[in-house]
């Protein structure tokens, strides 16, 4: 325990970049049987939304989600915080409020000391404390690589429920966190992270997406999702295709972490970037590789992608400002075209 443990050296993937690619996932789900068409299931997996929502009564529903992954940072406490923050995000992305969480822990008990796992759980509990919810239990297994995450339960009023497939043409698109998480964490894993960039990605990954709960109350917010492992373009393709519209993105207006261009030039591109483009590229208008590398970068605990109709834009920006967010539109939704997404 005298030498600091580098958790990223014990995993083949990192964070949401560990996700099975959408193309492979499609094969898995296609042969797994049809979803039970329960009318009380307001949101299931048909639209690949962030969480499932089941009616408690005519006005309120329970929101259920789970998310877990392998280490994306070396520090155990930070890994726990990030994994928990990322899992809780799905509740906020539906416009809901989290109620409680249970932990999911896989640990190579013959390789890493239990004291390190304890720090991971402690970090997860810290994120739950910040969200105002209890880490009420969990389940653990002996696994070949470290894994941590949460299953989270929340609640949402039906009138506040936000989906990823209800956007309309004319909506402006907003992103609440900068891109580049996968790029900087890949640089960290390769020991190429510059001193001035240490903890930059970590701080964003540990930032809760609480604004999503506030945005749920806004009628002008027509659709919302969080940007995670499939990258901005992957999640935007799902929003556009699910809503029957197309999207135009202005590349220069997409927020990004400082230093991403430097690290891309250094070859710090996570493997998930290529898998994302391989899965969604046919739905995206042709674009240069450097734009693919940023816009398909898998995010862990990424920001909210919000579609706002023009009539509700002023109210949305006012609410965002009250929450400390200074947002500018990164694009808009238009009538459906051959491509789901075009980058200008």
UniProtKB/Swiss-Prot annotation:
Active-site residues annotated for this sequence: 16
Cofactor note: Binds 1 Mg(2+) ion per monomer.
Sequence positions that bind ATP: 19, 47-49, 67, 90, 138-140
Subunit structure: Homodimer.
Obligatory cofactor(s): Mg(2+)
Organism per entry: Bordetella bronchiseptica (strain ATCC BAA-588 / NCTC 13252 / RB50)
Top-level division of the source organism's lineage: Bacteria
Record-annotated site: Important for catalytic activity: 19
PANTHER family: INACTIVE SELENIDE, WATER DIKINASE-LIKE PROTEIN-RELATED, SELENIDE, WATER DIKINASE
Family, per entry: Belongs to the selenophosphate synthase 1 family. Class I subfamily.
Organism ancestry: Bacteria, Pseudomonadati, Pseudomonadota, Betaproteobacteria, Burkholderiales
Gene3D superfamilies assigned: PurM-like C-terminal domain (3.90.650.10), PurM-like, N-terminal domain (3.30.1330.10)
Family matches, as InterPro entries: PurM-like_C_dom, PurM-like_C_sf, PurM-like_N, PurM-like_N_sf, SelD_I, SPS/SelD
Example of a GO biological process term: selenocysteine biosynthetic process
SUPFAM superfamilies associated with the record: PurM C-terminal domain-like (SSF56042), PurM N-terminal domain-like (SSF55326)
Name this protein carries in UniProt: Selenide, water dikinase
One of the record's GO molecular function terms: selenide, water dikinase activity
Catalytic activity: hydrogenselenide + ATP + H2O = selenophosphate + AMP + phosphate + 2 H(+)
GO cellular component: cytoplasm
């Amino acid at each position: 325990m005298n030498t600091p443990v580098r958790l990223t050296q014990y995993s083949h993937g990192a964070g949401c970049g560990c996700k099975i690619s959408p193309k492979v996932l499609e094969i898995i789900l296609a042969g797994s049987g049809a979803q039970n068409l329960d009318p009380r299931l307001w949101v299931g997996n048909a639209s690949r939304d962030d969480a499932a929502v089941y009616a408690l009564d005519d006005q309120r529903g329970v929101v259920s989600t789970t998310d877990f992954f392998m280490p994306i940072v070396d520090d155990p406490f930070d890994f726990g915080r990030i994994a928990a923050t990322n899992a809780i995000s799905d509740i906020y992305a539906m416009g809901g409020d989290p109620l409680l969480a249970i932990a999911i822990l896989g640990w190579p008990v013959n390789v890493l000391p239990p004291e390190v796992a304890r720090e991971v759980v402690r970090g997860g509990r810290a994120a739950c404390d910040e969200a105002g919810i209890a880490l009420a239990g969990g389940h653990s297994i002996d696994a070949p690589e470290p894994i941590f995450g949460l299953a989270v339960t929340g609640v949402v009023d039906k009138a506040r429920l936000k989906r990823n497939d209800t956007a309309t043409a004319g909506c402006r698109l907003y992103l609440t966190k900068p891109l580049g998480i996968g790029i900087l964490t890949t640089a960290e894993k390769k020991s190429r992270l510059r001193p001035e960039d240490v903890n930059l990605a970590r701080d964003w990954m540990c930032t809760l997406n609480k604004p999503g709960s506030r945005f749920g109350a806004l009628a002008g917010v027509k659709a919302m999702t969080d940007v995670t492992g499939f990258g901005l373009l992957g999640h935007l393709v799902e929003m556009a295709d699910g809503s029957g519209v197309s999207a135009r993105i202005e590349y220069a207006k997409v927020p990004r972490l400082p230093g991403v261009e430097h690290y891309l030039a250094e070859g710090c591109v996570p493997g998930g970037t290529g898998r994302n483009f391989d899965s969604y590229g046919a739905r995206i208008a042709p674009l240069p590789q450097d734009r693919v590398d940023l816009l398909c970068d898998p995010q862990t605990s990424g920001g909210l992608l919000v579609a706002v109709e023009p009539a509700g834009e002023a109210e949305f920006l006012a609410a965002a400002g009250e929450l400390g967010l200074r947002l500018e539109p990164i694009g808009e939704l238009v009538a459906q075209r051959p491509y789901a997404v075009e980058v200008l």
